[in-house]
Amino acid sequence: MQEDVYRSGIRKNLNRILQELTDDGKLDFESVPYQNLKAEIEKRDEECTEVLCKVLLETASRSGCADRQFVLQLFNEYFCNSSLFRDQILNDPKEFIEIMLETDPIRNPLPGSKSEGNELKSKSLAFIKNWEKMYAKNDARMKCLAVTLRKTKFVDYENGEKKIEEERKRREFLDERRRMIVERTLSLYKSKFEEIKEDVERLKMELETTMEMLVPSFTNSDDVDIPMDIPSTSSKSFELVIEDLSPLIKVNADNDAIVEAFLGAKTVLIHRVQTMRKLAKGLLPLKGAGESLAQSIIDYRDVIKKLVLKADEIRIKTKKKPVQKAKKFDDDFIDVEISIDDILMVQYANEASEDVKEDVKEPEKKLANPKKEEPKVKFVSFGLDLKYWGEERKDVEVPKNNADCHRFWRSADESTVAGTVHDTVYTQRQFTFVGEAPKIDRECLAKLPSGALCKRKDMFKCPLHGPLVDRDANGKPVKDEDRLKEIDRKERKRLKEAEEFSRKIVKEYESKTKRKRKHEEETSVRSRLQKKLFDPKTIQRVSADITSQQRSRLEKNFSHQFSHL
C-alpha cells in the first residue's frame, strides 16, 4: 500500500515536470517537481530508486517519441548523478534499449513517424556513448551493453548517429532547395504579373478614355447646382418608364476609329483577366508563400473585371455590309461567245420542229440573259471519220455475222461474202470554232543554269519551272512563300538526281563485277513479320495443322454418316 502511494507521488511529480517544459523543448531542472524527484534519489534508498526507474520506464512505454525524449533526459540526469539508478539500468538494460533504441521492432516498435523515431534513436545513442566514455573503464556491465548494441542488427551503433546526421542534413538540403524553388517561382509569377499590370494599365486608360468620348458624363460639373426636389403648385403628375438605360452608339465616319479602339481594348482586357485568373490558380500549390501575391492578383483582376462589365453595357450598332453573292463560275475559265453557226443551226432546227414557239423562246432567253446561263461547250457525235482521222478509206469490207460472235435469237450467217460501207461514213467532217485566242504576255523569268532568265511565255504554268510567280531582276521569287516553294522544288530535284546517279553507279558496278549488290534489308516490324509469316515452310506447316484440325473435327461430327464416307 505504501509502495503504491509512493509510486503515485512520483508519477504526479513526473507529469508536472513534463507539463512545465521550457520554450526550447528541454526540461526545467530548477523546477519544484524535479527537485522533489532529486530529493528522493539523494535518499540513497534502493527501493525508492527501483520504484522511480520502473515508473520512468512505464511512462516512456506509454508515451510517444516526443515525450520519450523528455524522459530520456531524466534517465541521463539520474544515470550520471546516482549510482543506484545506474545499477538498476545496467543490471537489466533490455527494456530500456527496447523502448529507446527499438531493438525489437516486431514486438515493440517505436510509435509515431519515422523521423521522430530516428531523432529519439540518435539522442539515445549519443547518451549511451557518453556513458560508455565515462563508466566503461570501471564497469564491465557498461562494456557488455556497448558490445550488445554493436552486435544487434537493428541498431547501427558505430555509424547510426552519422547516418541520422546525414539524413538530417539531406532533409535540410531538400527544405532549402524547396524554399529556393518557391522563391524562384514567386519571382517569376511576380515578374509576369508586373508585365501584365503595365499592359493592363495602358489598356485601362485607353478603355476609360474611349468610354468617356463615346458616352460623356454630364454629372461631374460643379458649377450648376440643380436641386433634386423642385417645388411646384401643379397637382398633375407624370410617370415615365425607361425601358433600357444602357447607351446605344451608332457607328459612323466620325466615331469609327474611336469605336474600333474601344472594342480592341475591351477584347484584350478580357484576355488579360483570364490570364490573371490562371496566374492566381498557379499560385495555389505554393500555399502560404504565394497567398499574398495571389490575393493581390485577384483584387486587381476584380477591379479590371468591373471595368470590362461596365464597358459591356454599351451597345454598338454597326452598319450591315452588303452581302456579295458568290460567283457560280471559277475565274480561271474564259467565257466563249456563241458562234453564228450555232445560232443558225438552232433556228433551222426550230423551223423543222412541230413546236416552233416553245423552241424559239429558249435561244431568245439565252441571248437576253447571257450572264445568268453559261454557253454550253460545243460537242460532235463520234463517228468512223474521227476514228480514222487523216486516213483515206474506200470500199471497206464489213464482216458478216460470224459464228464466233455471241448471238442468242438467230443462227449464224454461213456466207463469207463481205459487205461494203458507204464512202460518206469516212468523209472527214469540218468543224468551225470561232473565238479569240487569249493574249499571253507573261514570262517565266526563272533562272537557268547558264545564268540567263527563262523567256518562255505561258498563262499559268511553265513546263520546266512550274507555276508562274512574280520574280525580280535576278530571277528570285518576290514572295516568301514562293521562295520557299522554289527551294523545296530544287531540293526534290537534287535528291532525284542523286538517286538516279547512285542507281547508275550500282548498275555499272554490277555490270563490271557480274554480280548483284546486296541491298539493305528493311528492319521494320512489318518486314520482319512478313519474312516470318510468309515463309513457304511456315505456310506449309500452318496449313497442315489447320487441315488436320478440320479433318478431326469433321470426323468427330459426321463420321457416323454414310455420305461423309
From Swiss-Prot:
UniProt xrefs under InterPro entries: UVSSA (IPR018610), UVSSA_C (IPR049431), UVSSA_N_a-solenoid_rpt (IPR049408)
Species assigned in the record: Caenorhabditis briggsae
Primary localization: nucleus
Role description: Factor involved in transcription-coupled nucleotide excision repair (TC-NER) in response to UV damage. TC-NER allows RNA polymerase II-blocking lesions to be rapidly removed from the transcribed strand of active genes.
Coiled coil: 155-215, 480-510
Annotated segments matching region Disordered: 510-530, 542-565
Pfam families reported in the protein's UniProt record: DUF2043, UVSSA_N
Binding residues annotated for Zn(2+), in chain numbering: 444, 454, 462, 465
Localization: Chromosome
Entry-linked PANTHER family: UV-STIMULATED SCAFFOLD PROTEIN A (PTHR28670:SF1)
Gene Ontology MF terms in the entry: RNA polymerase II complex binding
Protein name per its UniProtKB record: UV-stimulated scaffold protein A homolog
UniProt keywords, alphabetically: Chromosome, Coiled coil, DNA damage, DNA repair, Metal-binding, Zinc, Zinc-finger
Gene designation: uvs-1
Annotated family: Belongs to the UVSSA family.
UVSSA-type zinc-finger residues: 441-468
Chain intervals for the UniProt region annotation (VHS-like): 11-156
Any one GO cellular component localisation term in the record: chromosome
GO BP terms, alphabetized: response to UV; transcription-coupled nucleotide-excision repair
